[in-house]
Amino acid sequence: MLPREREALVAWLAASTQLLLGALRQAGPDSGCWTWWPASQSPQSAGGIARHRVQETSVHAYDAQAAVGAPQPLPAEAALDGVEEFLLTVCATPSPWPHEPTSFDFHAAEGRSWRLTVDGDGARATRVPAPGTTAGQAPDAVGASVHGTAGELVLFCYDRLPAGTLRVDGDAGLIDLLRAWEPEE
C-alpha cells in the first residue's frame, strides 16, 4: 500500500526509484526485458526502460509543478530525447492507420526534426533534417507539421498542451485524428 503522508511518499518513491535503477544497472543497457511497447521501434531492453523512465519523470514533474501553479520548462536535453522517445515508443506500431496515408513532422526550435509516417503498414518515426538546414532541398509533403520547443513538443505529445498552443502547419484536422488514434498493437 502507498503511504499517505508526504514525507513517507517521497521516501517510498526514492526507494522505489533506487530499486529500479539498481536492477537496470545490474542487467546492463542491452539486456532484453519485458516492456509495455512490444510492437514499437524502441528496444525492449533495460536501456529502453531507463530512457522511458526519464521521460515519465520529466512529464510527471511538470504535472506536479503545474498542479501548484508553477510549471517549469522541461530540461532541454531530456525534452529533445523525449520527442524522439515518444514517437519511437508510443506512436510506432504495425497497426494499420485507418485513414489516408500521411506524414506528420515535429520541428523543435532547438534544431531537431522528426517525421511520423502513417499508412496501412502502421506508423514509423524517423529523424529528418530541420527546415532550412539543407540548401536547395525542397521539403517533403506532409499532412501536418507541429513547431515548438522540444519541451513544448513533449508536453503536446503527452497531451499536456493543446494543439492550439503550438504552431501547426498543414491540415490541423490530421493532428486531431492522430491524437484520437488508438492502435491495436
For each feature predicted by the language model, list its residue ranges.
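Short amphipathic alpha-helical/adjacent loop interface patches that line ligand
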Residues: 17, 57, 150
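C-terminal interaction segments
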Residues: 137-185
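Short, solvent-exposed segments of well-ordered alpha helices
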Residues: 4-7, 44-51, 144
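Short, helix-capping/interhelical loops that line the mouth of catalytic, cofactor-
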Residues: 1-35, 71-81
